[in-house]
Amino acid sequence: MKKTLLTLMAFVLSFGVCFANPKANPDEGMWLPMFFKQLNHSTMQKMGLKLSAEQLYSINNSSLKDAIVQMGDFCTGEIVSDKGLMFTNHHCGYDAIVSQSTVEHDYLNNGFVSQSFEEELPIPGLYVSFLVRMADVTKEVLAENINTPENATEEQIQKNIGDLVVKYSEEGKYKVEVKPFFEGLEYYMFIYEVFNDVRLVFAPPASIGKYGGDTDNWMWPRHTGDFSVFRVYADKNNQPAEYSKDNVPYKPKHFLPISIKGVEKGDFTMIWGYPGSTERYMTSYEVSNTINISDPAVIKAGEALLPVMKKMMDTD
């Protein structure tokens, strides 16, 4: 989760909305939250989901979307208390932990825990974004080329996107992003409320928190404490604000209640978050092109290059 192509899908931690259903089979689909109700909510209910579509995603009432945040532009976090407490991965909080570490206070290697709000450490430059709403803006972006998107010029597209950003940002109140889907056939707008006062609350020692990098990333079972804890702050009116000692813990519209009941085989589990990138929306033609053209070309180039590199390595 180190880059951001915004779709709200894959979670950073194991967040589950769990209800027993031993007969349920995994469904590895990937959906935008605004389409839950019309595409797959009924299917998820049959698999054990007990939340309504409105409880998952709503622009008028608090919902699950209000508890899942984008941390910086690189990770996902989840709000777990009515005082803005946020969980994320240790590797997502790594740079923040490093920025506060010194020779005298080696928080990276020794860990850190605050005993009060006053002891929490401000992290300059770190922010979190709460999704306010998202919308299909394909018609606005492609305009007169809606039926022939291949004719839309990049200059036209960027101008139309810029107009949308200005219109919906409300003079800087919101962060607005417009992202292409299906290689530019569709465009979706994401409107965020951004909080710039984020503070470190807890970090385990690196010996516990380090998740293994590429060496261990795809190995199971793995026993690591890949987590860190932060808190989001707001002004006294609960609005986004730059860091100030007068700021107070943010009161979220919704937070995830923590359960210690454990899970059972067959419990319903849903993953929600901001993946770094995804190719889950590739068409069959794109998959065919990758398998039959792109990958073979890369492999052929590698087969030509690697022997040359090996020969040079052996002489050194």
Task: Locate predicted features.
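Bacterial Sec-dependent N-terminal signal peptides
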Residues: 1-26
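Terminal presequence/propeptide segments associated with secretion/organelle targeting
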Residues: 19-316
